[in-house]
């Protein structure tokens, strides 16, 4: 009897390991790269730096996967193409890096794409896709899955972003705050928050959101990642 139980246990472990290995291989094949280029470039005025461009695509034959891939190619692929054209002409690059991360939640894939620009600006893109249903994952679906209402989500998001804003500019003197329009900037930042901000489920099962925070210098605003719900 003990021998039978031991044999069954071994079989279960082997099946589990095989299943996990299959799932891991399936996940690896689920995403491919439209661009995968690394190198070093020096322009005609002597600006030199390493560049790295990696832009993902979803490997699935559905209308939603095709739509997401087109959006990614238009937003991030075109950016890379512009840098290639600049290299051909010996001109300066305005973007040097584009990278992506994949977060899995069962059959759900969430892609986070980050691309930098000169001046410290970062562009973010978040996309969700369910391989089981072959459909795009919307913000509303994420909240429903987590059992969170839109009101609760927006309240937490505003609290988180306000904390980020205040922490970001905590070192500014009252004089500089007044000159920069600190209160107006905070009001503007919170006013940008709605259900349209891209969100995704991260590796810990928390919800992360791409938000805009008003800036006292440089661009009017910059993108940041906010985590209104960090639990799984």
Show where each model-derived region lies.
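Sec-dependent N-terminal signal peptides of Gram-positive bacterial secreted proteins and lipoproteins
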Residues: 4-23
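Compositionally biased intrinsically disordered regions enriched in Thr/Gly
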Residues: 21-232
């Amino acid at each position: 009897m003990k021998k039978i139980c031991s044999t069954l246990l071994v079989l279960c472990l082997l099946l589990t390991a095989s299943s996990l290995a299959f799932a891991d291989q399936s996940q690896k094949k689920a995403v491919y790269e439209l661009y995968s280029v690394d190198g070093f470039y020096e322009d005609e005025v002597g600006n030199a730096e390493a560049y790295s461009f990696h832009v993902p695509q979803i490997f699935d034959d559905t209308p939603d996967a095709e739509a997401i891939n087109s959006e990614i190619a238009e937003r991030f692929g075109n950016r890379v193409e512009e840098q290639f054209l600049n290299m051909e002409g010996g001109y300066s690059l305005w973007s040097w890096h584009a990278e992506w991360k994949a977060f899995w939640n069962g059959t759900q894939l969430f892609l986070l794409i980050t691309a930098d620009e000169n001046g410290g600006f970062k562009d973010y893109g978040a996309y969700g896709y369910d391989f089981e249903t072959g459909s795009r994952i919307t913000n509303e679906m994420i909240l429903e899955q987590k059992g969170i209402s839109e009101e609760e989500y927006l309240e937490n998001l505003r609290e988180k972003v306000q904390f980020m804003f205040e922490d970001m500019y905590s070192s500014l003197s009252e004089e500089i705050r007044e000159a920069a329009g600190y209160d107006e900037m905070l009001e503007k930042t919170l006013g940008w928050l709605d259900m349209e901000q891209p969100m995704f489920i991260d590796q810990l099962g928390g919800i992360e959101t791409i938000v805009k925070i008003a800036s006292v210098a440089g661009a009017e605003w910059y993108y940041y990642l906010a985590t209104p719900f960090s639990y799984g």
